[in-house]
Amino acid sequence: VITSLLRATDCDMKTAIPRMQNYFEFYVEIFGALSFKQSLTNDSELREMVESGIVHVFENCDAKGRCMRVMQYNQIRTGLNSDALQITKMFHYVTMRTLKNYPMTQKNGFMDVCDMGGLSLENFSLRITRSNLLMSSRFLPCKVHKICVLRPLYFMKFLLRAVKPYAFPGPMARHFLILSQDPKDLLKDPVFCR
């Protein structure tokens, strides 16, 4: 965790130390103790969430070796896998495994794609969206290079524009793209994939 955070912040201790404190506080709040270790073999709920298809990771998606996390909101089903805490734990597990397996992602960051296509209002949870944004921007020991929101629900277009300066202050907000149903939007440089 510490190595990943130092790489993500380019060894800037002024940035790394508060982020490290935030991560450890977040970890204790979610898992109860720093000594707790997530494992698919011991946690059937976590395994079920990982296998649910909500989050997919694609490695080495650009010339700098960044990984892409694709979150498909239409895979979240009310009552089945919609518990915000379980989704947070699953997102943490997937992110930490990716950082461990792909050191270039530690340094160069993730590209996140949030696909809301096929999502209905009854399955939408602002809490899940907000917790994932905050977790990526404030707590996890990683850098987010670019975020693309594909096919957002109509009201989300306005909500995300208001939230992005708060969730990603400074220059990061430039890399937060909201793409509509129009395929031409994909040509507006959302992600450089090989």
Locate each region found by the language model.
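Acidic, metal-coordinating catalytic cores used for nucleic-acid/nucleotide bond scission
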Residues: 118-122, 151-156
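Aromatic/basic-lined ligand-recognition segments
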Residues: 1-120
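Extracytoplasmic/secreted proteins and extracellular or luminal domains
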Residues: 139-140, 168
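Short aromatic-glycine motifs in intrinsically disordered, low-complexity regions
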Residues: 129-139
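Short coil/turn segments at secondary-structure boundaries
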Residues: 18, 82, 125-128, 160-163
